[in-house]
């Protein structure tokens, strides 16, 4: 799966659920934990999500 495809799927899941977890993304996207973490870092730097311990949250989510 291409990086752009993974990013789109991560953002889609995040939009639906407000929170995504690395372990869930590993299973859904069938890729390694390090790849998911790298993707989350890239999306965080792009300002598309907020990385948290073990996953990420939507920027629209307030806890």
Which residues does each predicted region cover?
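HTH-adjacent hinge/linker in prokaryotic transcriptional regulators
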Residues: 2-23, 27-30, 38-63
């Amino acid at each position: 799966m291409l990086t752009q495809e993974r990013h789109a799927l991560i953002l889609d899941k995040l939009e639906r659920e407000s929170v995504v977890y690395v372990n869930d993304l590993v299973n859904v996207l069938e890729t390694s934990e390090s790849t998911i973490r790298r993707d989350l870092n890239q999306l965080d730097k792009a300002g598309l999500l907020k990385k948290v311990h073990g996953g990420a949250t939507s920027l629209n989510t307030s806890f």
